[in-house]
Amino acid sequence: MLIKQFSRRPKNMKVQILLAFAALFVLAVGSYASESKKLDLRDASFSAMFSADYQLNPQERGCRYFLGECKKTSECCEHLACHDKHKWCAWDWTIGK
């Protein structure tokens, strides 16, 4: 009788350990998926914020305003320059009329 109890325990313990690892795996996958959705939403809102100037025609307004998309500095308004890396109009550190 004592031998039967010890022979059952390791099987039961193996099942418990397996269930614990399975639960940790499910939690890890769920956490990763949740974080991935947050990052995707953040990236989408960030890119939408800076690409919103496509709705305005540059010929109608004459120049591109602050953080507007550009290819060269001549497209940007006064006191703005086209940023080399990000390709948007940024302040060129000049002041005056």
Swiss-Prot record:
A matching Pfam family: Toxin_12
GO cellular component: extracellular region
Family annotation (InterPro entries): Huwentoxin-1, Huwentoxin_CS1
Record organism: Cyriopagopus hainanus (Chinese bird spider)
Disulfide pairings: 63-77, 70-82, 76-89
Signal sequence segment: 1-33
The protein's name in its UniProt record: U6-theraphotoxin-Hhn1a 2
Signal as UniProt keyword: yes
Proregion positions: 34-61
Recorded family membership: Belongs to the neurotoxin 10 (Hwtx-1) family. 12 (Hntx-12) subfamily.
Sorted UniProt keywords: Disulfide bond, Ion channel impairing toxin, Knottin, Secreted, Signal, Toxin
Gene Ontology molecular function, alphabetical: ion channel inhibitor activity; toxin activity
